[in-house]
Amino acid sequence: MKKPTEEKTKEKAANKNQKKRLVLLDAHAILHRAYHALPDFSARNGEPTGALYGLVAMLLKIIEELKPDYITACFDLAGPTYRHDAYEHYKAGRAKTEDSLVKQIDRSRDVFAAFGIRIYDHAGFEADDMLGTIVEQTKKMKDIDVVIASGDMDT
């Protein structure tokens, strides 16, 4: 029979060789997908919550299945990006985001805070840009695997 300290030593050695896992979230894309995929849930006060429900369900699933060491959410901010400077018609055909989704996007920051998830956003850049930058920076760290969670096909 192995001694408990011997087992712990082997377990620690195995964990040292194991890579850490970083999950990156495209917050806007995830919320947008949840908003359109789920019913129009609302709180007693009438506040829309369907996209937030979808977000929480997804976060719980990611945490349970992927067991990440780190999670980061990236947001788009309102306003033009450097892409608008390069191409004046960038996203020109897009419909205005519905107010009930905008409210949930704003409230999602509270959800991420409750989960202890760090948020990144930067004027002039989209979440995709930040995700790509984080991935490029993380590639330099050989001990971290990156998983991107997004509902956006161009991420």
Q: Model regions: which residues?
A:
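Noncatalytic, basic helical substrate-engagement surface that gates or grips nucleic-acid strands
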Residues: 2-149, 153-155
